[in-house]
Amino acid sequence: MINFLTLSEVLQILENQVRNYGGAYGVRDMHLLSSAVYMPESSFGGNYLHETIPAMAAAYAYHLCQNHPFIDGNKRAALASSLVFLDLNGYEFECDDDVLYEKIMDVAKGEVKKEELIKFYEKYSRER
């Protein structure tokens, strides 16, 4: 069984990021937030559109970052949500912090397509 994140959990992740690193807490657009949070569990014909746990984690990172649903902390919440999702599903993510930072910044700038981010997550994610 896959442990998907709920809206409430993503909001808790944002709150934690803002509390620890600063910024303003709040949702700019609840519809964009809902869209991003539920994207990883989207399916068609009984099959998930994102077929692997790392691909689903990448979908959290990509859509939360691109949808920009929060007042502040979008990149931090996107990254943290993806890593929490991996952890909840028995995966670890091992990547140099600088490489990860650059990748998330590139996603935010629109320079990385979702397929590329999925490959990135598949490269650095391992089952525990």
Locate predicted features:
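FIC/Doc superfamily catalytic core
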Residues: M1-R128
